[in-house]
Amino acid sequence: FLPLLAASFACTVTKKC
């Protein structure tokens, strides 16, 4: 899991970008 990918996933799930 890449850090950038993890950040993108978290953004999608929490709706906090």
Swiss-Prot record:
Cystine crosslinks: C11-C17
A GO term from the CC aspect: extracellular region
Compartments reported by the entry: Secreted
Native source species: Rana arvalis (Moor frog)
Name under which the protein is recorded: Brevinin-1AVa
Recorded family membership: Belongs to the frog skin active peptide (FSAP) family. Brevinin subfamily.
GO biological process, one term: defense response to bacterium
Taxonomic classification: Eukaryota, Metazoa, Chordata, Craniata, Vertebrata
Keywords per UniProt: Amphibian defense peptide, Antibiotic, Antimicrobial, Disulfide bond, Secreted
Record function comment: Antimicrobial peptide.
Tissues where this protein is expressed: Expressed by the skin glands.
